Every structure is written in structure tokens, then in C-alpha cells.
């Protein structure tokens, strides 16, 4: 839930107007909108590069997953792994745009551990892949923008552990 929605819901639950503090937080959120959109655009424009480089790093760090018997062994399973990384990158962009972890949590992380466990997919490898994406993505961003995006990558990584 965005800061705007949270503030309105809280104020309405108490049958009151928005407080000066709530209005300041909303103002700050609105003023940061261009920056958040810029970050999301950079990540979106570079998604293929981010996913490809992160996949290469992951497969070098974890050769077990691309070896016979590994979850990403073979062309089809490697493509599935990269597709999953792309999915998590997309979730990160949702979080950046919203300025909130709610889209990441509500759209993509509910039941993820159970799903990967049922498929026999090592969750640690998924987390390592997301961390590799963070490194690639943050190298494309300025320091402040990198910290902003990094927060959402870190949240996603943490949910995998």
C-alpha cells in the first residue's frame, strides 16, 4: 500500500483530515516520483543485459545448477531460470515505482519458498541470482539511485532466505 493510500486509510479510520506529518510524507513521495520513474525506466531498458549478466554470474558461482541433474541443466531449464530472474527484476521495478514493498510482497513473494521447495529448486540459488541482478543493475545507476533500487532487491533477496 503506497504512502498516499496508507495515510488516507489511517486518517479515514479515525474520521480526521490528513495530519501535517502525513501531508509532508505524501509531498516527499510525490517529489521523489520522477526519480523513482527514472530508476524503473533504466532497469526496464536494461532488463535483458541485467538478467543475462546475472545469469552468467550465477552459473559461474553455482555450476551445480547447470550440471547434469541441476535445476537449470539444459537449454530449456536455463531459459526457465532466466525467466524467473526476469520476473523478480520486474517485481523490483514495481516496488521502485510504488515506493513500497507491497507490490513485491503481494504479487510475487507469497508462497515462493513453498513453490521452489516443491520443485526441488535451491532457494539459495534464486537468492544468489537476484543478488547478481542487484550488482549489475546498481552498476548502471548513480549512488542514490543505486541505494533506492538496492533496497527493493535486498527485500526480495531477504524473502528468499
UniProtKB/Swiss-Prot annotation:
Location (main, coarse): plastid
The protein, known as: Allophycocyanin alpha chain
Organism, as annotated: Galdieria sulphuraria
Any GO CC annotation of this UniProt entry: phycobilisome
Lineage: Eukaryota, Rhodophyta, Bangiophyceae, Galdieriales, Galdieriaceae
Domain of life of the native organism: Eukaryota
Subcellular localization(s) per the UniProt record: Plastid, Chloroplast thylakoid membrane
Statement: the UniProt record of this protein carries the keyword Electron transport: yes
InterPro entries registered for this protein in UniProt: Globin-like_sf (IPR009050), Phycobilisome_asu/bsu (IPR012128), Phycobilisome_asu/bsu_sf (IPR038719)
Keywords for the protein's UniProt record, in alphabetical order: Antenna complex, Bile pigment, Chloroplast, Chromophore, Electron transport, Membrane, Methylation, Photosynthesis, Phycobilisome, Plastid, Thylakoid, Transport
Note: Although originally identified as Cyanidium caldarium, these sequences derive from Galdieria sulphuraria.
Membrane topology of this protein: Peripheral membrane protein
Pfam families according to UniProt: Phycobilisome
Function of the protein: Light-harvesting photosynthetic bile pigment-protein from the phycobiliprotein complex. Allophycocyanin has a maximum absorption at approximately 650 nanometers.
Residues bearing the modification N4-methylasparagine: 71
Gene coding for it: apcA
Post-translational modification: Contains one covalently linked phycocyanobilin chromophore.
GO BP: photosynthesis
Family affiliation: Belongs to the phycobiliprotein family.
Record's subunit section: Heterodimer of an alpha and a beta chain.
Chain sites annotated for binding (2R,3E)-phycocyanobilin: 81
Amino acid at each position: 500500500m503506497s504512502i498516499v493510500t496508507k495515510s488516507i486509510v489511517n486518517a479515514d479510520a479515525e474520521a480526521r483530515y490528513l495530519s501535517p506529518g502525513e501531508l509532508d510524507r505524501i509531498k516527499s513521495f510525490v517529489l521523489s516520483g520522477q526519480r523513482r520513474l527514472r530508476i524503473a525506466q533504466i532497469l526496464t531498458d536494461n532488463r535483458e543485459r541485467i538478467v543475462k549478466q546475472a545469469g552468467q554470474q550465477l552459473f559461474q558461482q553455482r555450476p551445480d545448477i547447470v550440471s547434469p541433474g541441476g535445476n537449470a541443466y539444459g537449454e530449456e531449464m536455463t531459459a526457465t531460470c532466466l525467466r524467473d530472474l526476469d520476473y523478480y527484476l520486474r517485481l523490483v521495478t514495481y516496488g521502485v515505482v510504488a515506493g513500497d514493498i507491497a507490490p513485491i510482497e503481494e504479487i510475487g513473494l507469497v508462497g515462493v519458498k513453498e513453490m521452489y521447495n516443491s520443485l526441488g529448486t535451491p532457494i539459495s540459488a534464486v537468492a544468489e541470482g537476484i543478488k547478481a541482478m542487484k550488482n549489475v543493475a546498481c552498476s548502471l545507476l548513480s549512488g542514490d539511485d543505486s541505494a533506492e533500487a538496492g533496497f527493493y532487491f535486498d527485500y526480495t533477496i531477504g524473502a528468499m532466505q
